[in-house]
């Protein structure tokens, strides 16, 4: 026991307490090894973090020379819950059925088809704004018996209207519009043939026949009418 001359009891108290351990006696934390085997065998690796970022998406690019206000509406984008995270939403494209062709013309063959399969809607990006579908120009194939009867009626009269045209169409099992278009085309052909024959006769005498303004206007008016009434069959 140690005794202090100044504090006699100091040595007594020092003797009652156990000796403090040295720094060398403290437990040491094992050093971490950074070799491959040690890293692979670790069980305290942090779990991989799941990316919580929302996926970015962009609507489809418009065709060249068209803006988003001019092209048809893109597929609808719906918000669907992400698997495993019901509270988080992810934007995913989902194609909705398109509307049918709204062409009001009863002769349109595309009525009832999906507008995405309509030839006019697929080729023209503005067709859904520009009104009814424009019908293709397809000529009617007449039978020899029908042509013979039509030519016979044309020799009688170049214009057929009213009940006569309706009766002729019913007799030949044709529509009234088909008969009307045939007579219009036949009149144009007859005018061209007559003009060529007239020019051929006058050319024998060295005379060149100029086209008259009345004939040109008449032909132009007939051709424009033909464009308006020609139908798809």
Curated annotation (Swiss-Prot):
Localized to the dorsal lip of the blastopore (Spemann organizer) during early gastrulation, after which expression continues in tissues derived from the organizer. Expressed in the notochord during mid-gastrulation, the chordoneural hinge, notochord and ventral spinal cord of the tailbud at stage 22, and finally the tip of the tail in the tadpole (stage 35). Keywords: Developmental protein, DNA-binding, Homeobox, Nucleus, Repressor, Transcription, Transcription regulation. Residues 220-233 have a biased composition (Acidic residues). Residues 135-194 bind DNA. The keyword Nucleus applies. Transcriptional repressor. Plays a fundamental role in notochord formation, acting within the mesodermal region. Acts downstream of gsc and upstream of chrd and foxa4-A/pintallavis. This is Homeobox protein not2. It comes from Xenopus laevis (African clawed frog). The lineage of its organism: Eukaryota, Metazoa, Chordata, Craniata, Vertebrata. The gene is not2.
